[in-house]
């Protein structure tokens, strides 16, 4: 009821909440009244098998998740998640009809050494490796600069726009301009 009361009936954008696993089902039920997208905060890179503690894309789909975050900076730094794992998770999510929200971003040192575009382009290319254009347009990219997480700092509008334009240029090189334009990029 609180969600419904606080979301405008007509919106110009999609609203998605990515919740911890135990809350996905309840959020999915609550979100039906107000066109709320429901997602998970992570997924296993493995489709099947005995991976204790892991939640598969198939399980997320059964819970009603429509989206899932992959490559979040906390997963990369605390759990050593690699670009190869982000790519594997992206592919598994797409196979299970879940929209991947692919996080990319640079550290403060990379920004200070003018490596932002190079590093972010590498992350994007790695995440989209092996994806067709049809698969790519089903993905969302979230620019998430590491230097802005939990620090109280935020990217300026100009900085965010510059990196988002660079991401779109990378996508155009990987695919084409129309495909790049069709992929949502968030900050």
Task: Cite the ranges covered by each PLM segment.
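Active-site loop-to-helix "anion-binding N-cap" substructures in soluble metabolic enzymes
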Residues: 1-187
